[in-house]
């Protein structure tokens, strides 16, 4: 009976965890997305202060295609507290069609979080990324800097979507 009760408790929790939306309500992912153009190295320009990235500078994300259609994700940054490089390897999968930039990413087993490209310039040089709620936001660039006009545009988009842009950490690249 105890096992049945545990099983019955686990099912609703599992359904809730795995059926949650990967994008905040009212926000749309980029459409007409080209996965091949997005792959490669990106520099993290700004982010919210997440436990898993705390004290990291020189932060990058590198995306490459896996044979099964998923995307290999390698995040790397220099920990200024320990003076050591830290990296994490995971995988990303499209939630819907590959032309919609709504993905889920995992760095640990079957547990996925939202990864949504919500703004992207036509040349795939700058990207604004939202997680599955308003607590996750990144600004990425193909270089270690971003033009002031792009920064202003992305901050306005994020603020309009409900993100608290005053909480962003601006990543140092040196």
Model-derived regions, located:
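Bacterial N-terminal signal peptides that target proteins for export
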Residues: 1-8
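Bacterial N-terminal signal peptides
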Residues: 9-16
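A beta-rich soluble binding module of mature secreted/lumenal proteins
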Residues: 16-174
